[in-house]
Design a protein with these regions (language model features):
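Non-catalytic cap/lid and distal C-terminal segments of serine-dependent acyl enzymes
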Residues: 1-111
Length: 111
């Protein structure tokens, strides 16, 4: 299975790619991002993603990150679909300091 991860806008692209191509990615990392726009049939797409057999869906965001509200929308969508995921929240904001932490935590999960 392939892995995909992204930070900030790249995290948004990760969400879009995985809900539109649910059978492609088995390991998904979303760092400091969330749902910023309405997606057509988000509930159905999330259910299809869940059914595809995702091995790991990992989300992280800093408590002071300006995208926290969008991040919470992603968590609500994941909860609604019943998707299993791990969530990590730490201090700090939208910064490379946090993204280094997130990548160092997520990358070992791929092996």
């Amino acid at each position: 299975m392939r892995a995909i991860a992204g930070l900030s806008m790249g995290g948004g692209h990760t969400i879009t790619a995985t809900i539109n191509y649910p059978e492609v990615f088995g390991y998904i990392g979303v760092f400091s991002s969330g749902i910023f726009q309405p997606y057509e049939d988000l509930d159905g797409k999330m259910l299809a993603l869940k059914a595809s057999g995702v091995k790991k869906y990992w989300v992280a965001c800093g408590e002071d990150d300006f995208v926290m509200e969008s991040n919470k929308k992603l968590l609500v969508a994941l909860d609604k679909s019943g998707m299993e995921y791990e969530y990590y929240e730490n201090s700090g904001g939208h910064s490379w300091k946090n993204w280094r932490i997130y990548l160092s935590m997520f990358s070992p999960m791929l092996f």
